[in-house]
Regions:
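An N-terminal assembly and electron-transfer interface module characteristic of large anaerobic redox
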Residues: 2-578
Length: 578
Protein backbone atom coordinates (compact mmCIF):
# COMPACT_ATOMS: atom_id res chain seq x y z
CA UNK A 1 0.00 0.00 0.00
CA UNK A 2 1.24 3.50 -0.89
CA UNK A 3 2.63 5.37 2.16
CA UNK A 4 0.15 8.23 1.71
CA UNK A 5 -2.78 5.87 1.57
CA UNK A 6 -1.50 4.01 4.60
CA UNK A 7 -1.20 7.28 6.56
CA UNK A 8 -4.71 8.32 5.58
CA UNK A 9 -6.04 4.86 6.54
CA UNK A 10 -4.29 4.84 9.92
CA UNK A 11 -5.50 8.37 10.60
CA UNK A 12 -9.08 7.33 9.85
CA UNK A 13 -8.76 4.26 12.09
CA UNK A 14 -7.44 6.48 14.89
CA UNK A 15 -10.42 8.81 14.57
CA UNK A 16 -12.83 5.85 14.71
CA UNK A 17 -11.08 4.49 17.79
CA UNK A 18 -11.33 7.87 19.50
CA UNK A 19 -15.04 8.07 18.67
CA UNK A 20 -15.60 4.54 20.00
CA UNK A 21 -13.73 5.34 23.19
CA UNK A 22 -15.78 8.50 23.57
CA UNK A 23 -19.02 6.56 23.04
CA UNK A 24 -17.93 3.91 25.50
CA UNK A 25 -17.01 6.59 28.01
CA UNK A 26 -20.32 8.37 27.51
CA UNK A 27 -22.19 5.08 27.78
CA UNK A 28 -20.37 4.21 30.98
CA UNK A 29 -21.01 7.71 32.29
CA UNK A 30 -24.70 7.34 31.43
CA UNK A 31 -24.84 4.01 33.23
CA UNK A 32 -23.17 5.55 36.28
CA UNK A 33 -25.47 8.57 36.20
CA UNK A 34 -28.59 6.45 35.69
CA UNK A 35 -27.46 4.08 38.40
CA UNK A 36 -26.89 7.01 40.70
CA UNK A 37 -30.26 8.48 39.82
CA UNK A 38 -31.93 5.11 40.39
CA UNK A 39 -30.15 4.78 43.69
CA UNK A 40 -31.07 8.32 44.65
CA UNK A 41 -34.67 7.70 43.57
CA UNK A 42 -34.81 4.54 45.63
CA UNK A 43 -33.19 6.25 48.61
CA UNK A 44 -35.04 9.56 48.56
CA UNK A 45 -38.13 9.25 46.33
CA UNK A 46 -39.28 5.64 45.88
CA UNK A 47 -42.16 3.81 47.48
CA UNK A 48 -41.97 2.93 51.18
CA UNK A 49 -43.12 -0.68 51.53
CA UNK A 50 -44.39 -1.61 55.01
CA UNK A 51 -45.26 -5.20 55.92
CA UNK A 52 -47.64 -6.13 58.75
CA UNK A 53 -47.44 -9.58 60.32
CA UNK A 54 -50.16 -11.19 62.48
CA UNK A 55 -52.46 -8.17 62.35
CA UNK A 56 -56.22 -8.35 62.88
CA UNK A 57 -58.25 -7.12 59.93
CA UNK A 58 -59.95 -4.47 62.08
CA UNK A 59 -56.64 -2.83 63.06
CA UNK A 60 -55.14 -3.21 59.59
CA UNK A 61 -58.26 -1.69 58.04
CA UNK A 62 -57.94 1.34 60.30
CA UNK A 63 -54.27 1.78 59.34
CA UNK A 64 -55.17 1.42 55.68
CA UNK A 65 -57.87 4.11 55.93
CA UNK A 66 -55.31 6.42 57.54
CA UNK A 67 -52.90 6.11 54.61
CA UNK A 68 -53.37 8.90 52.06
CA UNK A 69 -49.79 8.83 50.75
CA UNK A 70 -49.47 7.23 47.31
CA UNK A 71 -45.77 6.58 48.01
CA UNK A 72 -46.52 4.33 51.00
CA UNK A 73 -47.55 0.76 50.19
CA UNK A 74 -48.99 -1.44 52.94
CA UNK A 75 -48.92 -5.24 52.76
CA UNK A 76 -50.24 -7.99 54.99
CA UNK A 77 -47.83 -10.91 55.22
CA UNK A 78 -47.93 -14.42 56.65
CA UNK A 79 -45.24 -17.00 57.32
CA UNK A 80 -45.65 -18.07 53.68
CA UNK A 81 -44.03 -14.75 52.69
CA UNK A 82 -40.91 -15.13 54.84
CA UNK A 83 -38.69 -15.84 51.82
CA UNK A 84 -39.39 -12.30 50.60
CA UNK A 85 -38.98 -10.25 53.77
CA UNK A 86 -36.07 -8.35 52.20
CA UNK A 87 -38.53 -6.78 49.75
CA UNK A 88 -39.86 -4.44 52.44
CA UNK A 89 -38.57 -1.23 54.01
CA UNK A 90 -40.20 -1.85 57.40
CA UNK A 91 -41.76 -4.85 59.14
CA UNK A 92 -44.27 -4.37 61.97
CA UNK A 93 -45.24 -7.45 63.96
CA UNK A 94 -48.17 -7.92 66.32
CA UNK A 95 -46.58 -10.27 68.83
CA UNK A 96 -49.81 -11.14 70.66
CA UNK A 97 -50.59 -14.76 69.86
CA UNK A 98 -47.90 -14.92 67.16
CA UNK A 99 -47.25 -18.55 66.26
CA UNK A 100 -43.97 -19.20 64.48
CA UNK A 101 -41.58 -22.12 64.70
CA UNK A 102 -37.81 -21.94 65.25
CA UNK A 103 -36.97 -21.80 61.54
CA UNK A 104 -39.49 -19.03 60.92
CA UNK A 105 -38.24 -17.10 63.94
CA UNK A 106 -34.69 -17.38 62.57
CA UNK A 107 -35.86 -16.09 59.18
CA UNK A 108 -37.51 -13.11 60.82
CA UNK A 109 -34.45 -12.37 62.95
CA UNK A 110 -32.12 -12.53 59.93
CA UNK A 111 -34.42 -10.25 57.95
CA UNK A 112 -34.43 -7.75 60.83
CA UNK A 113 -30.67 -7.21 60.34
CA UNK A 114 -31.44 -5.72 56.91
CA UNK A 115 -35.00 -4.47 57.31
CA UNK A 116 -36.05 -2.27 60.27
CA UNK A 117 -38.39 -4.43 62.36
CA UNK A 118 -40.66 -3.62 65.29
CA UNK A 119 -42.59 -6.18 67.35
CA UNK A 120 -45.16 -5.01 69.88
CA UNK A 121 -47.29 -6.84 72.47
CA UNK A 122 -45.16 -10.00 72.26
CA UNK A 123 -46.60 -12.69 74.53
CA UNK A 124 -43.54 -14.88 73.90
CA UNK A 125 -40.24 -13.10 74.74
CA UNK A 126 -38.50 -15.08 71.99
CA UNK A 127 -40.73 -13.36 69.44
CA UNK A 128 -39.87 -9.84 70.62
CA UNK A 129 -37.76 -9.03 67.57
CA UNK A 130 -36.86 -5.33 67.30
CA UNK A 131 -34.14 -3.83 65.12
CA UNK A 132 -35.04 -0.13 65.18
CA UNK A 133 -33.31 2.01 67.79
CA UNK A 134 -34.93 2.67 71.17
CA UNK A 135 -36.03 6.20 70.32
CA UNK A 136 -37.80 5.16 67.11
CA UNK A 137 -39.28 2.07 68.76
CA UNK A 138 -40.71 4.13 71.61
CA UNK A 139 -42.24 6.71 69.29
CA UNK A 140 -43.77 4.11 66.98
CA UNK A 141 -45.13 2.17 69.96
CA UNK A 142 -46.92 5.30 71.21
CA UNK A 143 -48.59 5.75 67.83
CA UNK A 144 -49.70 2.10 67.83
CA UNK A 145 -50.92 1.99 71.43
CA UNK A 146 -53.00 5.16 71.11
CA UNK A 147 -54.40 4.15 67.73
CA UNK A 148 -56.87 6.17 65.71
CA UNK A 149 -56.63 7.68 62.25
CA UNK A 150 -54.42 10.63 63.24
CA UNK A 151 -51.87 8.47 65.04
CA UNK A 152 -51.75 5.84 62.31
CA UNK A 153 -51.34 8.58 59.69
CA UNK A 154 -48.43 10.05 61.66
CA UNK A 155 -46.91 6.60 62.22
CA UNK A 156 -46.78 5.96 58.47
CA UNK A 157 -45.30 9.42 57.86
CA UNK A 158 -42.69 8.79 60.58
CA UNK A 159 -41.66 5.49 58.99
CA UNK A 160 -41.28 7.04 55.54
CA UNK A 161 -39.35 10.08 56.71
CA UNK A 162 -37.18 8.78 59.54
CA UNK A 163 -36.99 5.00 59.14
CA UNK A 164 -36.93 4.75 55.35
CA UNK A 165 -35.20 8.13 54.92
CA UNK A 166 -37.30 9.37 52.01
CA UNK A 167 -37.29 13.07 51.05
CA UNK A 168 -40.11 13.21 48.49
CA UNK A 169 -43.71 13.16 49.78
CA UNK A 170 -42.37 12.69 53.29
CA UNK A 171 -44.32 15.14 55.46
CA UNK A 172 -43.39 15.86 59.03
CA UNK A 173 -45.35 13.50 61.31
CA UNK A 174 -47.48 15.03 64.04
CA UNK A 175 -46.86 14.38 67.71
CA UNK A 176 -48.61 11.42 69.31
CA UNK A 177 -52.28 12.18 69.91
CA UNK A 178 -52.99 10.55 73.26
CA UNK A 179 -56.36 8.84 73.10
CA UNK A 180 -58.72 9.85 75.93
CA UNK A 181 -60.55 7.04 77.69
CA UNK A 182 -64.07 8.02 76.68
CA UNK A 183 -67.25 6.50 78.09
CA UNK A 184 -69.16 6.66 74.80
CA UNK A 185 -68.11 7.08 71.19
CA UNK A 186 -69.74 7.67 67.82
CA UNK A 187 -68.38 7.85 64.30
CA UNK A 188 -68.02 11.37 62.96
CA UNK A 189 -70.90 12.00 60.50
CA UNK A 190 -68.65 14.47 58.67
CA UNK A 191 -65.75 12.00 58.38
CA UNK A 192 -66.95 8.42 58.79
CA UNK A 193 -63.46 7.00 58.20
CA UNK A 194 -61.88 9.36 60.72
CA UNK A 195 -61.37 8.98 64.44
CA UNK A 196 -64.46 8.33 66.52
CA UNK A 197 -65.80 11.22 68.56
CA UNK A 198 -65.75 10.73 72.33
CA UNK A 199 -68.15 11.66 75.13
CA UNK A 200 -68.05 11.25 78.91
CA UNK A 201 -71.70 11.84 79.77
CA UNK A 202 -75.16 11.06 78.46
CA UNK A 203 -75.85 14.80 78.26
CA UNK A 204 -72.88 15.38 75.92
CA UNK A 205 -73.83 12.39 73.80
CA UNK A 206 -77.50 13.40 73.51
CA UNK A 207 -76.47 16.92 72.51
CA UNK A 208 -74.33 15.42 69.74
CA UNK A 209 -77.23 13.23 68.57
CA UNK A 210 -79.60 16.20 68.54
CA UNK A 211 -77.13 18.38 66.61
CA UNK A 212 -76.83 15.71 63.92
CA UNK A 213 -80.52 14.85 63.68
CA UNK A 214 -80.07 11.49 65.39
CA UNK A 215 -81.97 12.17 68.63
CA UNK A 216 -85.53 10.86 68.36
CA UNK A 217 -87.82 11.15 71.35
CA UNK A 218 -89.53 7.84 72.08
CA UNK A 219 -87.50 5.90 69.50
CA UNK A 220 -86.29 2.36 70.30
CA UNK A 221 -82.85 2.50 71.91
CA UNK A 222 -79.95 0.08 71.90
CA UNK A 223 -76.66 -0.09 73.75
CA UNK A 224 -73.91 -1.15 71.33
CA UNK A 225 -70.66 -2.49 72.74
CA UNK A 226 -67.66 -4.61 71.74
CA UNK A 227 -64.85 -4.16 69.22
CA UNK A 228 -64.92 -7.15 66.86
CA UNK A 229 -67.17 -5.62 64.22
CA UNK A 230 -67.34 -2.55 62.03
CA UNK A 231 -69.15 -0.35 64.55
CA UNK A 232 -69.95 2.54 62.16
CA UNK A 233 -71.67 0.15 59.74
CA UNK A 234 -73.88 -1.19 62.53
CA UNK A 235 -74.55 2.25 64.01
CA UNK A 236 -75.68 3.54 60.61
CA UNK A 237 -77.90 0.50 60.01
CA UNK A 238 -79.72 0.89 63.33
CA UNK A 239 -80.03 4.67 62.99
CA UNK A 240 -81.43 4.27 59.48
CA UNK A 241 -84.09 1.97 60.95
CA UNK A 242 -85.12 4.63 63.48
CA UNK A 243 -83.13 3.48 66.51
CA UNK A 244 -81.14 5.67 68.87
CA UNK A 245 -77.72 4.07 69.32
CA UNK A 246 -75.54 4.49 72.41
CA UNK A 247 -72.07 3.22 71.48
CA UNK A 248 -70.56 2.17 74.81
CA UNK A 249 -66.77 2.24 75.04
CA UNK A 250 -66.50 1.31 78.75
CA UNK A 251 -69.44 -0.95 79.51
CA UNK A 252 -68.65 -1.79 83.13
CA UNK A 253 -68.12 1.88 84.06
CA UNK A 254 -71.25 2.82 82.13
CA UNK A 255 -73.32 0.41 84.21
CA UNK A 256 -71.54 0.84 87.57
CA UNK A 257 -71.75 4.63 87.27
CA UNK A 258 -75.52 4.37 86.65
CA UNK A 259 -75.20 6.09 83.27
CA UNK A 260 -77.22 3.20 81.83
CA UNK A 261 -80.09 4.15 84.14
CA UNK A 262 -80.37 7.48 82.31
CA UNK A 263 -81.52 5.85 79.08
CA UNK A 264 -84.43 3.52 78.37
CA UNK A 265 -82.52 0.83 76.50
CA UNK A 266 -84.63 -1.76 74.69
CA UNK A 267 -81.75 -4.11 73.89
CA UNK A 268 -77.99 -4.59 74.07
CA UNK A 269 -75.89 -5.63 71.07
CA UNK A 270 -72.42 -6.99 71.84
CA UNK A 271 -70.02 -7.22 68.89
CA UNK A 272 -67.33 -9.08 70.86
CA UNK A 273 -67.22 -12.80 71.52
CA UNK A 274 -66.79 -14.40 74.94
CA UNK A 275 -68.55 -13.40 78.15
CA UNK A 276 -69.36 -9.93 79.45
CA UNK A 277 -69.53 -11.15 83.05
CA UNK A 278 -71.87 -11.63 86.00
CA UNK A 279 -72.26 -7.89 86.63
CA UNK A 280 -73.78 -7.59 83.18
CA UNK A 281 -76.12 -10.56 83.69
CA UNK A 282 -77.50 -8.86 86.81
CA UNK A 283 -77.97 -5.65 84.84
CA UNK A 284 -79.90 -7.50 82.12
CA UNK A 285 -82.13 -9.15 84.72
CA UNK A 286 -82.97 -5.78 86.27
CA UNK A 287 -83.76 -4.17 82.93
CA UNK A 288 -85.44 -7.26 81.44
CA UNK A 289 -84.05 -6.59 77.97
CA UNK A 290 -82.48 -8.99 75.43
CA UNK A 291 -78.79 -9.32 74.55
CA UNK A 292 -77.90 -9.94 70.90
CA UNK A 293 -74.60 -11.34 69.66
CA UNK A 294 -73.90 -10.63 65.97
CA UNK A 295 -70.99 -12.65 64.61
CA UNK A 296 -67.79 -11.69 62.83
CA UNK A 297 -66.58 -14.62 60.73
CA UNK A 298 -63.03 -13.23 60.85
CA UNK A 299 -62.28 -14.25 57.27
CA UNK A 300 -63.13 -13.25 53.72
CA UNK A 301 -66.87 -13.40 53.11
CA UNK A 302 -66.33 -15.22 49.81
CA UNK A 303 -64.29 -17.93 51.55
CA UNK A 304 -66.89 -18.35 54.29
CA UNK A 305 -69.76 -18.63 51.82
CA UNK A 306 -68.03 -21.48 49.99
CA UNK A 307 -67.04 -23.34 53.18
CA UNK A 308 -69.61 -25.91 54.35
CA UNK A 309 -68.27 -25.90 57.90
CA UNK A 310 -68.24 -22.13 58.22
CA UNK A 311 -66.74 -21.98 61.72
CA UNK A 312 -64.37 -24.32 63.51
CA UNK A 313 -65.09 -25.64 66.99
CA UNK A 314 -62.98 -23.24 69.05
CA UNK A 315 -64.12 -20.11 67.25
CA UNK A 316 -67.74 -21.29 67.34
CA UNK A 317 -67.46 -21.91 71.08
CA UNK A 318 -66.14 -18.40 71.76
CA UNK A 319 -68.58 -16.72 69.39
CA UNK A 320 -71.78 -18.67 70.05
CA UNK A 321 -71.63 -20.97 73.07
CA UNK A 322 -69.84 -18.73 75.59
CA UNK A 323 -72.02 -15.62 75.01
CA UNK A 324 -75.07 -17.79 75.66
CA UNK A 325 -73.92 -18.09 79.29
CA UNK A 326 -74.76 -14.38 79.57
CA UNK A 327 -78.09 -15.03 77.86
CA UNK A 328 -77.08 -13.85 74.38
CA UNK A 329 -79.40 -14.70 71.50
CA UNK A 330 -79.39 -14.44 67.71
CA UNK A 331 -75.81 -15.57 66.92
CA UNK A 332 -76.02 -14.40 63.33
CA UNK A 333 -73.20 -13.52 60.94
CA UNK A 334 -73.21 -9.78 60.26
CA UNK A 335 -69.51 -8.94 59.77
CA UNK A 336 -67.04 -10.36 57.29
CA UNK A 337 -63.85 -9.32 55.57
CA UNK A 338 -63.19 -8.01 52.07
CA UNK A 339 -60.15 -6.84 50.12
CA UNK A 340 -59.84 -3.05 50.03
CA UNK A 341 -58.21 -0.89 47.36
CA UNK A 342 -54.76 -1.44 48.91
CA UNK A 343 -55.16 -5.20 48.68
CA UNK A 344 -55.61 -5.55 52.46
CA UNK A 345 -58.39 -7.32 54.30
CA UNK A 346 -60.82 -5.08 56.16
CA UNK A 347 -63.87 -5.78 58.32
CA UNK A 348 -67.24 -4.57 57.06
CA UNK A 349 -70.94 -5.09 57.69
CA UNK A 350 -72.39 -7.47 55.08
CA UNK A 351 -75.27 -5.29 53.79
CA UNK A 352 -78.10 -7.82 53.38
CA UNK A 353 -77.21 -9.66 56.58
CA UNK A 354 -76.91 -6.39 58.50
CA UNK A 355 -80.38 -5.39 57.32
CA UNK A 356 -81.80 -8.78 58.33
CA UNK A 357 -80.17 -8.58 61.77
CA UNK A 358 -81.48 -5.07 62.45
CA UNK A 359 -84.97 -6.18 61.34
CA UNK A 360 -84.75 -9.08 63.77
CA UNK A 361 -83.77 -6.82 66.69
CA UNK A 362 -86.62 -4.49 65.79
CA UNK A 363 -88.97 -7.49 65.78
CA UNK A 364 -87.95 -8.42 69.33
CA UNK A 365 -88.37 -4.83 70.51
CA UNK A 366 -91.80 -4.50 68.89
CA UNK A 367 -92.86 -7.87 70.30
CA UNK A 368 -92.30 -6.64 73.84
CA UNK A 369 -94.49 -3.62 73.19
CA UNK A 370 -97.28 -5.60 71.52
CA UNK A 371 -100.32 -6.89 73.41
CA UNK A 372 -100.36 -10.66 73.88
CA UNK A 373 -103.76 -10.86 72.23
CA UNK A 374 -102.27 -9.42 69.02
CA UNK A 375 -99.10 -11.52 68.88
CA UNK A 376 -98.93 -14.16 66.15
CA UNK A 377 -96.86 -17.28 66.82
CA UNK A 378 -95.79 -20.10 64.49
CA UNK A 379 -94.82 -23.35 66.25
CA UNK A 380 -92.97 -25.99 64.23
CA UNK A 381 -92.93 -29.52 65.61
CA UNK A 382 -90.89 -32.49 64.45
CA UNK A 383 -92.49 -35.81 63.59
CA UNK A 384 -91.78 -38.62 61.19
CA UNK A 385 -93.90 -39.43 58.12
CA UNK A 386 -97.37 -40.96 58.37
CA UNK A 387 -98.57 -42.15 61.77
CA UNK A 388 -95.21 -41.58 63.50
CA UNK A 389 -95.54 -39.71 66.76
CA UNK A 390 -94.07 -36.33 67.61
CA UNK A 391 -90.71 -36.95 69.25
CA UNK A 392 -88.39 -35.41 71.82
CA UNK A 393 -86.04 -37.00 74.31
CA UNK A 394 -87.59 -37.09 77.78
CA UNK A 395 -90.71 -35.16 76.72
CA UNK A 396 -94.27 -36.20 75.95
CA UNK A 397 -94.58 -33.86 73.02
CA UNK A 398 -98.31 -33.67 72.33
CA UNK A 399 -99.32 -33.21 76.01
CA UNK A 400 -96.54 -30.62 76.39
CA UNK A 401 -97.66 -28.81 73.26
CA UNK A 402 -101.23 -28.81 74.53
CA UNK A 403 -100.06 -27.41 77.88
CA UNK A 404 -98.25 -24.64 76.03
CA UNK A 405 -101.42 -23.69 74.15
CA UNK A 406 -103.38 -23.62 77.41
CA UNK A 407 -100.67 -21.47 79.03
CA UNK A 408 -100.76 -19.07 76.09
CA UNK A 409 -104.52 -18.78 76.48
CA UNK A 410 -104.13 -18.02 80.18
CA UNK A 411 -101.52 -15.35 79.34
CA UNK A 412 -103.99 -13.55 77.09
CA UNK A 413 -102.96 -14.89 73.69
CA UNK A 414 -105.65 -15.46 71.09
CA UNK A 415 -105.68 -19.25 70.59
CA UNK A 416 -109.23 -19.53 69.27
CA UNK A 417 -111.08 -22.71 70.17
CA UNK A 418 -108.71 -25.32 71.58
CA UNK A 419 -109.37 -29.08 71.54
CA UNK A 420 -110.70 -30.48 74.79
CA UNK A 421 -107.59 -32.48 75.68
CA UNK A 422 -104.18 -33.66 74.40
CA UNK A 423 -105.74 -36.74 72.81
CA UNK A 424 -107.99 -34.59 70.64
CA UNK A 425 -104.98 -32.46 69.66
CA UNK A 426 -103.10 -35.62 68.64
CA UNK A 427 -105.98 -36.66 66.37
CA UNK A 428 -106.06 -33.21 64.78
CA UNK A 429 -102.30 -33.33 64.16
CA UNK A 430 -102.57 -36.70 62.42
CA UNK A 431 -105.41 -35.39 60.24
CA UNK A 432 -104.24 -31.85 59.49
CA UNK A 433 -100.59 -31.66 60.46
CA UNK A 434 -99.12 -34.88 59.15
CA UNK A 435 -95.85 -35.34 57.28
CA UNK A 436 -96.27 -37.35 54.10
CA UNK A 437 -93.74 -39.55 52.40
CA UNK A 438 -93.49 -39.29 48.65
CA UNK A 439 -95.16 -42.70 48.44
CA UNK A 440 -98.33 -41.79 50.39
CA UNK A 441 -100.48 -40.64 47.46
CA UNK A 442 -103.78 -41.90 48.88
CA UNK A 443 -103.28 -40.30 52.29
CA UNK A 444 -102.16 -37.07 50.64
CA UNK A 445 -105.28 -36.92 48.46
CA UNK A 446 -107.44 -37.31 51.56
CA UNK A 447 -105.41 -34.62 53.32
CA UNK A 448 -106.03 -32.12 50.50
CA UNK A 449 -109.77 -32.74 50.78
CA UNK A 450 -110.16 -32.56 54.56
CA UNK A 451 -106.89 -31.32 56.09
CA UNK A 452 -107.49 -27.59 55.42
CA UNK A 453 -103.90 -26.83 54.29
CA UNK A 454 -102.71 -23.35 53.43
CA UNK A 455 -102.25 -23.06 49.67
CA UNK A 456 -99.31 -21.13 48.25
CA UNK A 457 -99.49 -19.85 44.68
CA UNK A 458 -96.57 -19.59 42.28
CA UNK A 459 -96.79 -15.79 42.43
CA UNK A 460 -96.63 -15.76 46.24
CA UNK A 461 -93.74 -18.22 46.36
CA UNK A 462 -91.73 -16.27 43.79
CA UNK A 463 -92.17 -13.04 45.76
CA UNK A 464 -91.28 -14.64 49.09
CA UNK A 465 -88.18 -16.42 47.80
CA UNK A 466 -86.87 -13.25 46.17
CA UNK A 467 -87.09 -11.54 49.57
CA UNK A 468 -85.60 -14.35 51.63
CA UNK A 469 -83.41 -16.59 49.48
CA UNK A 470 -80.16 -16.15 47.63
CA UNK A 471 -80.28 -16.38 43.83
CA UNK A 472 -78.01 -19.39 44.15
CA UNK A 473 -80.50 -21.27 46.34
CA UNK A 474 -83.45 -20.44 44.06
CA UNK A 475 -81.50 -21.69 41.05
CA UNK A 476 -80.58 -24.94 42.81
CA UNK A 477 -84.19 -25.58 43.81
CA UNK A 478 -85.36 -25.04 40.24
CA UNK A 479 -82.69 -27.38 38.89
CA UNK A 480 -83.47 -30.12 41.43
CA UNK A 481 -87.26 -29.99 41.59
CA UNK A 482 -88.29 -28.43 38.30
CA UNK A 483 -90.70 -25.54 38.07
CA UNK A 484 -92.88 -24.65 41.07
CA UNK A 485 -94.66 -26.40 42.79
CA UNK A 486 -92.78 -29.59 41.93
CA UNK A 487 -94.36 -32.99 42.59
CA UNK A 488 -94.40 -33.20 46.40
CA UNK A 489 -97.43 -31.64 48.18
CA UNK A 490 -98.61 -30.08 44.90
CA UNK A 491 -102.22 -29.54 43.89
CA UNK A 492 -103.68 -30.15 40.45
CA UNK A 493 -104.03 -26.41 39.84
CA UNK A 494 -100.33 -25.66 40.47
CA UNK A 495 -100.40 -24.64 44.12
CA UNK A 496 -98.36 -25.95 47.03
CA UNK A 497 -100.06 -27.31 50.15
CA UNK A 498 -98.69 -26.33 53.57
CA UNK A 499 -99.94 -28.50 56.43
CA UNK A 500 -101.00 -26.46 59.44
CA UNK A 501 -103.38 -26.29 62.38
CA UNK A 502 -104.47 -22.78 63.23
CA UNK A 503 -105.81 -21.78 66.62
CA UNK A 504 -106.53 -18.07 66.49
CA UNK A 505 -103.20 -16.26 66.28
CA UNK A 506 -101.20 -19.44 66.90
CA UNK A 507 -100.43 -21.88 64.12
CA UNK A 508 -98.88 -25.35 64.43
CA UNK A 509 -96.86 -26.68 61.50
CA UNK A 510 -94.99 -29.93 60.98
CA UNK A 511 -91.41 -29.62 59.87
CA UNK A 512 -91.65 -31.46 56.57
CA UNK A 513 -88.86 -33.55 55.07
CA UNK A 514 -85.82 -31.46 54.11
CA UNK A 515 -85.09 -33.61 51.08
CA UNK A 516 -86.46 -36.39 48.93
CA UNK A 517 -85.78 -40.12 49.12
CA UNK A 518 -86.51 -43.14 51.28
CA UNK A 519 -83.87 -42.66 53.99
CA UNK A 520 -85.64 -40.25 56.36
CA UNK A 521 -82.84 -40.42 58.98
CA UNK A 522 -80.26 -39.28 56.45
CA UNK A 523 -82.55 -36.55 55.15
CA UNK A 524 -83.15 -35.18 58.65
CA UNK A 525 -79.46 -35.22 59.55
CA UNK A 526 -78.14 -33.49 56.48
CA UNK A 527 -78.29 -33.61 52.71
CA UNK A 528 -76.05 -31.87 50.23
CA UNK A 529 -79.00 -30.47 48.32
CA UNK A 530 -81.24 -27.46 48.44
CA UNK A 531 -84.43 -28.21 50.43
CA UNK A 532 -87.60 -28.94 48.40
CA UNK A 533 -90.24 -26.33 47.69
CA UNK A 534 -92.60 -27.55 50.40
CA UNK A 535 -89.90 -27.28 53.10
CA UNK A 536 -89.07 -23.71 52.19
CA UNK A 537 -92.72 -22.79 51.61
CA UNK A 538 -93.78 -23.82 55.13
CA UNK A 539 -91.29 -21.40 56.71
CA UNK A 540 -91.93 -18.60 54.24
CA UNK A 541 -95.69 -19.00 54.63
CA UNK A 542 -95.26 -18.68 58.41
CA UNK A 543 -93.17 -15.56 57.91
CA UNK A 544 -95.00 -13.80 55.09
CA UNK A 545 -98.35 -15.55 54.69
CA UNK A 546 -99.24 -15.90 58.36
CA UNK A 547 -97.13 -12.85 59.40
CA UNK A 548 -95.74 -14.53 62.51
CA UNK A 549 -94.17 -12.30 65.14
CA UNK A 550 -92.27 -15.23 66.62
CA UNK A 551 -91.28 -18.74 65.57
CA UNK A 552 -90.79 -21.68 67.94
CA UNK A 553 -89.25 -25.08 67.23
CA UNK A 554 -90.95 -27.47 69.63
CA UNK A 555 -89.73 -30.87 70.78
CA UNK A 556 -86.58 -32.56 69.52
CA UNK A 557 -84.17 -30.93 67.14
CA UNK A 558 -85.42 -30.95 63.59
CA UNK A 559 -83.62 -30.75 60.29
CA UNK A 560 -83.20 -26.97 59.97
CA UNK A 561 -79.70 -26.86 61.44
CA UNK A 562 -78.64 -29.63 59.06
CA UNK A 563 -79.99 -28.14 55.87
CA UNK A 564 -77.41 -27.06 53.37
CA UNK A 565 -75.37 -24.00 54.33
CA UNK A 566 -77.24 -23.39 57.59
CA UNK A 567 -74.57 -24.15 60.19
CA UNK A 568 -75.75 -21.71 62.84
CA UNK A 569 -74.60 -18.73 60.89
CA UNK A 570 -76.06 -19.24 57.42
CA UNK A 571 -79.81 -19.33 57.93
CA UNK A 572 -80.26 -16.31 55.69
CA UNK A 573 -78.56 -18.19 52.87
CA UNK A 574 -81.02 -21.02 53.35
CA UNK A 575 -83.68 -18.42 53.82
CA UNK A 576 -86.12 -20.55 55.78
CA UNK A 577 -86.26 -18.72 59.08
CA UNK A 578 -85.74 -15.32 60.54
Amino acid sequence: MHPDKRNRYEKKIGIIRKIKKKHIFLALLAVIVLGGLAKAYSAWVGTTRIAFLNYQAIALGQISHANDNAMIKLSEITTDDFDHLDDYDMIIVNGMGLRIDENQRKQLEEASYKVPTLTHAATNPANNIVSVDNFDADYLMQYIENGGKKNYHSMLAYIRKFIDGKKFMAPEPERVNERPDYLLTHFDPKDEKGDELGFNSIREYNAFLAKNGLYKEGAPTIMLTGFMGAAPDMEKAFEKKGFMVYRINKLQSFIAGHHADSIQANAVVNMAHGRLGDYFVEFMKQKNIPLFSPLNINRLTTEWESDKQGMNGGFMSQSIVTPEIDGAIRPYVVFGQRINKEGLQEVYGIPDRMESFVESVLGYVNLKNKKNSSKRIAIFYFKGPGQNALTASGMEVVPSLYNLLVRLKNEGYNVGKLPANPQELAKMIQAQGAVFGTYAEGAYTKFLQSGHPALVTAHQFAGWTQKALSKKMIKEMNQLYGSFPGKYMATDDGKLAVARLQFGNVVLLPQVMAGVGGDSFKIVHGTDQAPPYTYVASYLWARYGFSADALIHFGTHGSLEYTRESRWHSTATTGVTD
